[in-house]
From Swiss-Prot:
Substrate binds at residues 47, 85. This is 1-aminocyclopropane-1-carboxylate synthase 5. May be processed at its C-terminus. Belongs to the class-I pyridoxal-phosphate-dependent aminotransferase family. It catalyses: S-adenosyl-L-methionine = 1-aminocyclopropane-1-carboxylate + S-methyl-5'-thioadenosine + H(+). InterPro entries: Aminotransferase_I/II_large, Ethylene_sulfur-biosynth, NHTrfase_class1_PyrdxlP-BS, PyrdxlP-dep_Trfase, PyrdxlP-dep_Trfase_major, PyrdxlP-dep_Trfase_small. The modification N6-(pyridoxal phosphate)lysine is found at residue 272. 1-aminocyclopropane-1-carboxylate synthase (ACS) enzymes catalyze the conversion of S-adenosyl-L-methionine (SAM) into 1-aminocyclopropane-1-carboxylate (ACC), a direct precursor of ethylene. GO terms for molecular function: 1-aminocyclopropane-1-carboxylate synthase activity; pyridoxal phosphate binding. It is an enzyme of class 4 (lyase). Pfam families: Aminotran_1_2. Its cofactor is pyridoxal 5'-phosphate.
Length: 470
């Protein structure tokens, strides 16, 4: 053991988190409608499988892109050779325009300021290497994605200081919470280098308000620190509201091309909006030339393959397709989210009101034996081992209040979701709290129209996939 590095022998990866342990339990006994109908249903995977049919249809109509051809001629040899790690200009242009389209074309993205990375995991870590020394800190609002403990800290040596948010205001970021987190970092003798937020939020399923974004920009301006806005769920908005990017706020405040804009960085990915986590496509957008230059050099450790760039540049350049896709994706996400919420309500369970994402932030505080995180983990174990549903406990997301859980809804068929909700309802009704819930109060709920989405992807083994899905 003495011959190994501390990264190997330490527990900095966070693999013992209940977030990852739930995945491991699922892999031991995965649900299958025919082969294993009593198996565990995966509701801890933030994967978007609702619109695969649209992409498959596009591939059928565009065989050249899928077959690595140009004007009917194979370009296999061209794509098989070493690529420029700056990325293909055509693909970066298509990515920039797709990001603009998601934001209603209110803001623009310069392709030259985009750095490609093998997913948002790589993009976020690269930014940490660019912005922080080992021991420096970033402030993150809670609850936050459990993988950040690995992505931001494990190899970089950076620290995370939580910005404590509460259910009293829907877990929104407040000025007092920001100041308290900053002061806590100072007490710990940590140099604060910036704030990182996910917008829309994982795990809350809510987009940051304009007020919160204004507050964040004002805060990092006053402290002379950085702001990273992880916007990988920006195309999953399904409410009436438009997605507001931090880039919108910079434009509204007339801070474009200022020193402040050089300290605001956006992370994006095609894993959630297009449902392509296996393609490993992420990006950093920064107005700081030094960041772009350094991150581009670092990207050689996690490139996006030239074959992937060629295929997706063709897909994203088809404006008719992207417009129709984003609209239909929004409709299907909204329908699926409503189905989950309705099913939970029939079991006497409510959620934080959400307008984005592939999951709901579910309130099960009334099912806890005591108001403690120990009771939360006890409830989680019952749901995992007895009900056979893998969901993510709030404690794995550093939530300050026990009893909240992240439940995903876009990685399964409607029939599987209905079965999961049936199992959960049966469990709740078997508890003392469940027996007190009046069933008559739920008779007013209207059933949602079913939508069938075919060709659900068979879950590959835990050992065969990179465990960084959000």
């Amino acid at each position: 053991m003495k011959q190994l590095s501390t990264k190997v022998t330490s527990n900095g990866h966070g693999q013992d988190s209940s977030y990852f342990l739930g995945w491991e339990e699922y892999e031991k006994n995965p649900y299958d409608e025919i082969k294993n109908p009593n198996g565990m249903i995966q509701m801890g995977l933030a994967e978007n499988q609702l619109c695969f049919d649209l992409i498959e249809s596009w591939l059928t109509k565009n065989p050249d892109a899928a077959s690595l051809k140009r004007n009917g001629q194979s370009i296999f040899r061209e794509l098989a050779l070493f690529q420029d790690y700056h990325g293909m200009p055509e693909f970066k242009k298509a990515m920039a325009e797709f990001m603009e389209e998601i934001r209603g074309n209110r803001v623009t993205f310069d392709p030259k300021k985009i750095v490609l990375a093998a997913g948002s995991t790589s993009a976020n870590e690269t930014l940490m290497f660019c912005l922080a020394e080992p021991g420096d800190a970033f402030l993150l609002p809670t609850p936050y994605y459990p993988g950040f403990d690995r992505d931001l800290k494990w190899r970089t040596g950076a620290e995370i200081v939580p910005i404590h948010c509460s259910s009293s205001n829907g877990f929104q970021i407040t000025e007092s919470a920001l100041q308290q987190a900053y002061q806590q970092a100072q007490k710990l003798d940590l140099k604060v280098k910036g704030v990182l937020v996910t917008n829309p939020s994982n795990p809350l399923g809510t987009a940051l308000t304009r007020r919160e974004l204004n507050l964040l920009v004002d805060f990092i301006t006053s402290k002379n620190i950085h702001l990273i806005s992880d916007e990988i769920y920006s195309g999953t908005m399904f409410g009436f509201e438009q997605f507001i990017s931090v880039m919108d706020v910079l434009k509204d405040k007339k801070l474009e091309d200022t020193e402040v804009s050089k300290r605001v960085h956006v992370v994006y990915s095609l894993s959630k909006d297009l449902g392509l986590p296996g393609f490993r496509v992420g990006a950093i957008y920064s107005n700081d030339e030094m960041i772009v230059s350094a991150a581009t050099k670092m990207s050689s450790f996690g490139l996006v393959s030239s074959q992937t760039q060629y295929l997706l540049s063709a897909l994203l350049s088809d404006k008719k397709f992207t417009s129709q896709y984003l609209e239909e994706n929004q409709k299907r996400l909204k329908s699926r989210q409503r189905r989950l919420v309705s099913g939970l309500e029939s079991a006497g369970i409510t959620c934080l009101r959400s307008n984005a994402g592939l999951f709901c932030w579910v309130d099960m505080r009334h099912l806890l034996d005591t108001n403690t995180f120990e009771a939360e983990l006890d409830l989680w174990k019952k749901i995992v081992y007895n009900v056979k549903l893998n969901i993510s406990p709030g404690s794995s997301c550093h939530c300050t209040e026990p009893g909240w859980f992240r439940v995903c809804f876009a990685n399964m068929s409607e029939d599987t979701l209905d079965l999961a909700l049936k199992r959960l309802k049966t469990f709740v009704e078997s508890t003392d709290c469940g027996r007190m819930i009046s069933r008559s109060s739920h008779e007013r709920l209207k059933s949602l129209r079913k939508k069938t989405v075919s060709n659900w992807v068979f879950r590959v083994s835990w050992t065969d996939r990179v465990p960084d899905e959000r």
